[in-house]
Amino acid sequence: MSAGAGTPRRPAVRGSAPHPARGSAPGPRPMPTHHPTRGDKKRARRPGVPTRGDKKRAPRLGVPARGDKKRARRPGVPAREDKKRAPRPGVPTRGDKKRAPRLGVPARGDKKRARRPGVPTRGGVARSGNDGPRVPLALLGAYYPGHVTIRLYDTSARQIRDFAPLTPGCVSIYLCGATVQAAPHIGHIRSGLNFDIMRRWFAYRGYDVTFVRNVTDIDDKIIRKAAEQNRPWWSIGYENERAFNDAYAALGCLPPTYEPRATGHITEMVEMMRGLIERGHAYEADGNVYFDVRSLPGYLSLSNQDLDELRQPSEDGETGKRDLRDFAMWKAAKPGEPSWETPWGRGRPGWHLECSAMAHKYLGEEFDIHGGGIDLIFPHHENEIAQAKGFGDAFARYWVHNAWVTMSGEKMSKSLGNSVLVSEMVKKWPPVVLRYYLGTPHYRSTIEYSEESLREAESAYGRIEGFVQRVTELAGHAVEPAAEVPPAFAEAMDDDLGVPQALAIVHTTVRQGNSALAADDKDAAVARLAEVRAMLGVLGLDPLDAQWAGAQAQGEDLRHVVDSLVRLVLDQREGARARKDWATADAIRDQLGQSGLVIEDSPQGPRWSLGSR
């Protein structure tokens, strides 16, 4: 057999001439008429030879394609998928690791699936135009929620508890807002200010805060005042609602995420009453709807009272009660009063029902914190709990209450005639001083109002403000707040919002900064100012914040004029000191002091500032 006969021939491609067998004499190859470029060679393959792409689509006989190789594993060797299902004993698979995230850090999927009931998603809020104001980015600290523990005094537990949010990374707060029958006094506004500080601290710690503060715009007192003044009831509420908002804004309180009015949620109230009646916790009588207090075990647990010892008198028009302690959720209409249609006849809502229904709508069946003044514990908050739990809601997980502002030992109240209106206070005192005065005591401590304590607050804040101004002038620009507050400040705030202890850290840092100024240590003074600004920013007291800088700017022109006049007098004093005429120098200083100016001698020369009132 010849060599050519023993070599198998390649199959010919259909439609082309067969290739000669290996070893046979090749025929003469025609010479090309030109030398093709590399690109031409790629486009001009030899006739009958498939391109590389064709080879992929038509693999050689008996040779599996690359994709087939993956499916055709060697016998007895498990596929990669099988390996995932059979890990080494004691070693978790990658999927298990995803399901077991780090402690306190929610998985990405969990965040998406665990929305707060009743609260629209971010996309829904943006489309509906109901998105609340955003907390300033300056308040967002370098901490991630779950890495720190904030502790709060829970009225229902009667002890300080570690705060554990319902949804990791989020905190939901409902604050009982104003009943707008009159303009606000400083006792009213303290509650909003205390919870503004709470909200700012949660935001600094990295939480996404939803803050709801309602407006009670229908009430017995509003109706009574409207009748006395011969005005529409709604005009009373609207006028005083604006006064409250102006007061909150004047004292630097951040706007709430939602601020619902009671009259805008009658539908939700009717639904809650219907559910309570169906569950046997409420009943209708003579057009009124009452809550049956004996139907709910645990009623009065918040205020720690005994139901059998409770004596709650009925109000006018509340007829048909099964028990005198049953409270009205809905009041039958009376001539001349506003009313709404319900399945039980026309009427208007009771005070307690309003908050239960609005909290359910905006924060869902369960939320984190319910707040208000201590005077609301009973009956208002107690009855809110009864309605919500009777409806099937878990309701608030923590109850936080602020103390009163008193005058001569009595709670500040318009009915007692001892109230001081915010609108009058801001005419006599800088609003930032009023914020300092109301916000710096612990929220559970009573504030006894006096002019003397206000002057002390003004003097204390003036020392902080003076330090900020001196270092800013030395630096030649506004020093940015530090990225984090000092650890001692954070520790105080984490412990039941210990503002007094936190402010002690602020004043200590100010003293350190003043010492650095006296030693001509600019870098240390600037570093202390950065820390002070970070701490004051959390408390809403930063003098360089836009809220207060505007008021400072208004007085700058006047300050320059006064500064020029004072400088003339100080130059005379310096001349007397140079001549060692100490009597004249002291006399000038004393005269300036009688005018309300404080003179401070420093290595850079004399400085002046306004003294306390």
UniProtKB/Swiss-Prot annotation:
InterPro entries: Cys-tRNA-ligase, Cys-tRNA-synt_Ia_DALR, Cys-tRNA/MSH_ligase, CysS_C, Rossmann-like_a/b/a_fold, tRNA-synt_1_cat_dom, tRNAsynth_Ia_anticodon-bd. Its cofactor is Zn(2+). The keyword Metal-binding applies. Zn(2+) binds at C176, C355, H380, E384. It catalyses: tRNA(Cys) + L-cysteine + ATP = L-cysteinyl-tRNA(Cys) + AMP + diphosphate. Its EC number is 6.1.1.16. A motif ('KMSKS' region) lies at residues 411-415. ATP binds at K414. Pfam families: CysS_C, DALR_2, tRNA-synt_1e. Gene3D superfamilies: Cysteine-tRNA ligase, C-terminal anti-codon recognition domain, HUPs. Residues 36-119 are annotated as: 6 X 14 AA tandem repeats of P-[TA]-R-G-D-K-K-R-A-[RP]-R-[PL]-G-V. One of its GO terms (cellular component) is cytosol. GO terms for molecular function: ATP binding; cysteine-tRNA ligase activity; zinc ion binding. Binds 1 zinc ion per subunit. The keyword Nucleotide-binding applies. Its main location: cytoplasm. Transmembrane segments: none annotated. It is found in: Cytoplasm. Belongs to the class-I aminoacyl-tRNA synthetase family. Monomer. This is Cysteine--tRNA ligase. It comes from Streptomyces coelicolor (strain ATCC BAA-471 / A3(2) / M145).
